């Protein structure tokens, strides 16, 4: 099952948080979901070259807050914050209610699965060989600290008449392990031969139930093994005179 299901949805509430954070009632659920879809679709299309890795939408009783996590936040903010004000006005007109927009920088773009997938898709649209594009991003991800990465491309690869799927794996990507912190991204490359789908899985390490990384636990175990063991206390078997 872990091989088929979306690894992000499988780990929600375990080591992954929701991207839409609000509590609706029966009447407002459909309206809120539609607003979230409009916001995400618009931002993904307009800010594609800013490298948007994630969009978090939070709601309170009277307020809506949109947090955009991007690799190149300067493109979104603009000169002296002019572009972000235009973006805010556009989103308010789109959903018909006041909102605030926050921008955060994606500091590790090399191991962000969504950005890696979009990078491969962009290279395929520029007619770069798909194997070269896949191996390049996998090398960059491992340099960035990824424990494992899997990249899959599907479609008319290299202009072949019959569509097929090819994938490469470096390191380990334990999809069945729920405590494994796995990021997943998907992108599409629109080429002259048709649409090519790109999927990326990145394994960033294991997180224990209490939130302690597995690497820290290993170091603690090594430190415990290095400590010299004390000799057991000798019991005085002789009788006191």
UniProtKB/Swiss-Prot annotation:
Could you give one GO CC term from the UniProt record? cytosolic small ribosomal subunit
Q: Where are the transmembrane segments?
A: none
Q: Where is the composition biased (Basic and acidic residues)?
A: 215-226
GO BP terms in the entry: translation
Look up keyword Nucleus and say if it applies.
Answer: no
Keywords for this entry?
A: Ribonucleoprotein, Ribosomal protein, RNA-binding, rRNA-binding
Which molecular-function annotation in GO is an example for this chain? Answer: structural constituent of ribosome
This protein's superkingdom?
Bacteria
Q: Which SUPFAM superfamilies match?
A: Prokaryotic type KH domain (KH-domain type II) (SSF54814), Ribosomal protein S3 C-terminal domain (SSF54821)
Give any Pfam family that matches. Answer: KH_2
Question: According to the UniProt record, where is the region Disordered?
Answer: 214-241
Q: Where is the KH type-2 domain?
A: 39-107
Role noted for this protein: Binds the lower part of the 30S subunit head. Binds mRNA in the 70S ribosome, positioning it for translation.
Q: Which NCBIfam families match?
A: rpsC_bact
Q: How does it assemble?
A: Part of the 30S ribosomal subunit. Forms a tight complex with proteins S10 and S14.
Which family is this sequence assigned to?
Answer: Belongs to the universal ribosomal protein uS3 family.
UniProt name for this protein:
Small ribosomal subunit protein uS3
Species whose genome carries this gene: Sulfurimonas denitrificans (strain ATCC 33889 / DSM 1251)
The gene for this chain is rpsC
